[in-house]
Amino acid sequence: MPANAPITQDVHTIPRKLPDGPVNLVGLTRAAMRDALIAEGTPEKQAKMRVGQIWQWIYQWGVRDFDLMTNLSKAYRAQLKEKFVVEVPEVVTRQVSEDGTRKYLVRIAGGHEVEVVYIPDEGRGTLCVSSQVGCTLTCSFCHTGTQKLVRNLTAAEIIGQVMVARDDLGEWPEIGAPKDETRLLSNIVLMGMGEPLYNFENVRDAMKIAMDPEGIQLSRRRITLSTSGVVPEIARTAVEIGCQLAVSFHATTDDVRDTLVPINKRWNIEVLLEALRAYPKVSNSERITFEYVMLHGVNDSDEDARRLVKLIDGIPAKINLIPFNEWPGAPYKRSSNNRIRAFADIIYKAGYASPIRTPRGEDIMAACGQLKSATERARKSRKQIAAETGLAGA
């Protein structure tokens, strides 16, 4: 299929509209916020200034109560309270792994739930953000792929995940305090539930807010979007977001990738690589990260490693090797440590960085490929769970 093939409506799930009521200012672009303020009575000449003030309160200071926005007049604050709200997703549960990883189950409009993961590391902290409720891609090794797509998240629900994580980490700076460059949440990866490029506009708007210099202030180099290979949107990502790009590659032949990542049947390896070769030039990114989950006897041979090196020749790249994180009923097994190291060594000797990802948060089902909303898991009957885990009749 050509790279410019249109994305059909069957992969777009329109976010459910909230009931009539106050407008949530979270997730609006600056232009949309300006229009919303004008529509509710803010004089047009003042609107740009008001957007700047409110924007700073929400995204720089983490303030959600209009009464605390003290550089606005009391009358204007009362007007805002009548017409608008500043709302973020509700944290339903918070789990902390033995390794310090935190997993949040957050509830969004309609009662739906998604998972968000914070991964602390030396000198950095990464938040893994979801973009959809469920997923449409049905990647055979991924737990999220077993949960049907319900809908896209709104920009408010995406940036709201960042905001609730900052709440939990105590990351909002004290108003008036000297600027502190030390951050617990320093990076965002769009690697949670869903395919970000099947929700492009909302992901773009949320990440623009994250990168805004008067708000959360994350550099585009600290934001990584991971795609399974929605080729028509890759060039658009380079132009309209400009963040780092990771691709869920996972196989070196179309036959294997068709099974592991079924979107490959639509945009195969050759077409995907063509789009990836152009990305660093357009986005000014240093390199592309190729994510490669290590599956015993499926994609982990020396031949696979050598073929991978040939496929990506000429692309500035890092190959991130991911030991498979098993989940109940998973049809695959993790490659042995020796096999993973041998695979990595072939890639390294060819001149590519080939770090082996250390699994994080496995004890709370927060590792790569394990995310699935708790309510979805809870819907399974005891019989289904027993069958999946091999405990039937025990």
Curated annotation (Swiss-Prot):
The active site is at E115 (proton acceptor), C368 (s-methylcysteine intermediate). Its EC number is 2.1.1.192. It is an enzyme of class 2 (transferase). [4Fe-4S] cluster binds at C135, C139, C142. It holds the Pfam family RlmN_N. GO terms for molecular function: 4 iron, 4 sulfur cluster binding; metal ion binding; rRNA (adenine(2503)-C2-)-methyltransferase activity; rRNA binding; tRNA (adenine(37)-C2)-methyltransferase activity; tRNA binding. CDD domains: Radical_SAM (cd01335). GO terms for cellular component: cytoplasm. Residues 121-363 form the Radical SAM core domain. Its main location: cytoplasm. Keywords: 4Fe-4S, Cytoplasm, Disulfide bond, Iron, Iron-sulfur, Metal-binding, Methyltransferase, rRNA processing, S-adenosyl-L-methionine, Transferase, tRNA processing. Binds 1 [4Fe-4S] cluster. The cluster is coordinated with 3 cysteines and an exchangeable S-adenosyl-L-methionine. The keyword Membrane does not apply. S-adenosyl-L-methionine binds at G194, E195, S226, S248, F249, H250, N325. It catalyses: adenosine(2503) in 23S rRNA + 2 reduced [2Fe-2S]-[ferredoxin] + 2 S-adenosyl-L-methionine = 2-methyladenosine(2503) in 23S rRNA + 5'-deoxyadenosine + L-methionine + 2 oxidized [2Fe-2S]-[ferredoxin] + S-adenosyl-L-homocysteine; adenosine(37) in tRNA + 2 reduced [2Fe-2S]-[ferredoxin] + 2 S-adenosyl-L-methionine = 2-methyladenosine(37) in tRNA + 5'-deoxyadenosine + L-methionine + 2 oxidized [2Fe-2S]-[ferredoxin] + S-adenosyl-L-homocysteine. It is found in: Cytoplasm. Disulfide bonds join C128-C368. PANTHER family: 23S RRNA METHYLTRANSFERASE, RADICAL SAM CORE DOMAIN-CONTAINING PROTEIN. Reaction proceeds by a ping-pong mechanism involving intermediate methylation of a conserved cysteine residue. Specifically methylates position 2 of adenine 2503 in 23S rRNA and position 2 of adenine 37 in tRNAs. m2A2503 modification seems to play a crucial role in the proofreading step occurring at the peptidyl transferase center and thus would serve to optimize ribosomal fidelity. This is Dual-specificity RNA methyltransferase RlmN. It comes from Roseobacter denitrificans (strain ATCC 33942 / OCh 114) (Erythrobacter sp. (strain OCh 114)). The gene is rlmN.
